[in-house]
């Protein structure tokens, strides 16, 4: 795997923003050891704009940073879950064939974005919940409750914040796209 300098910088910036933004002081505690993090919007944005590899690494490294600075130790199961969320949301530009880059963000594109956010949260944090239950003997009902709360909360947060950000990105790209066509 050969990453360009630009990609490495994007991953570092995204992971730092997601990692620091994921700290408990910026989140909303919702359940046992479970916090709704507004930083999920950062993960979704980097995933949509730069693809699955950047999304995975921003989620993985960023969650690792959160866990290290929060002081509760690194929970690799949840670090992996955040990486998977970023990976799945990162397929958005491939599925839409880069419509956002052309300044297009339709209702169908938004629905796909929300679906990928939900799917990413269910698969990513579903893996985390399963692995917590198997590896750490966490009560199954607890990890399933965490999964349901986080998947629903994160999807809602990503949908609301993401709608405004991606609409603005599309508008900006459309202006740039129109300038290129005028040349």
From Swiss-Prot:
From the record, give the transmembrane residue ranges.
8-28, 41-61, 69-89, 110-130, 147-167
Give the UniProt keywords, A-Z. Answer: Cell membrane, Membrane, Transmembrane, Transmembrane helix
Which InterPro entries would you find in this protein's record? ECF_substrate-spec-like (IPR009825), UPF0397 (IPR022914)
Q: Name one Pfam family in it.
A: ECF-ribofla_trS
Q: How does it sit in the membrane?
A: Multi-pass membrane protein
Q: Which domain of life is it from?
A: Bacteria
A single GO CC term, please?
Answer: plasma membrane
Q: What is its main location?
A: membrane
Localization per Swiss-Prot or TrEMBL:
Cell membrane
Q: Which NCBIfam families match?
A: PRK13661.1
Q: HAMAP family this protein is in?
A: UPF0397
Similarity remark: Belongs to the UPF0397 family.
The identity of this protein, by name, is UPF0397 protein PBPRA2239
Originating species? Photobacterium profundum (strain SS9)
Q: What is the lineage of its organism?
A: Bacteria, Pseudomonadati, Pseudomonadota, Gammaproteobacteria, Vibrionales
């Amino acid at each position: 795997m050969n990453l360009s300098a630009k990609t490495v910088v994007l991953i570092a910036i995204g992971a730092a923003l997601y990692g620091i933004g994921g700290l408990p002081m910026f989140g909303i505690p919702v359940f046992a050891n479970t916090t709704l993090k507004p930083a999920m919007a950062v993960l979704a944005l980097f995933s949509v704009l730069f693809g699955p590899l950047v999304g995975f690494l921003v989620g993985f490294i960023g969650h690792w940073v959160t866990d290290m600075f929060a002081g509760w130790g690194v929970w690799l199961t949840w670090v992996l879950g955040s990486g998977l969320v970023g990976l799945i949301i990162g397929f958005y530009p491939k599925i839409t064939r880069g419509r956002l880059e052309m300044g297009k963000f339709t209702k169908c594109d938004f629905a796909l974005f929300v679906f990928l956010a939900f799917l990413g949260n269910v698969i990513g944090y579903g893996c985390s919940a399963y692995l917590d239950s198997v590896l750490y003997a966490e009560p199954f009902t607890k990890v399933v409750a965490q999964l349901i709360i986080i998947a629903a909360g994160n999807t809602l947060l990503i949908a609301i914040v993401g709608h405004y950000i991606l609409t603005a990105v599309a508008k900006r790209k459309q202006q740039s796209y129109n300038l290129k066509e005028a040349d």
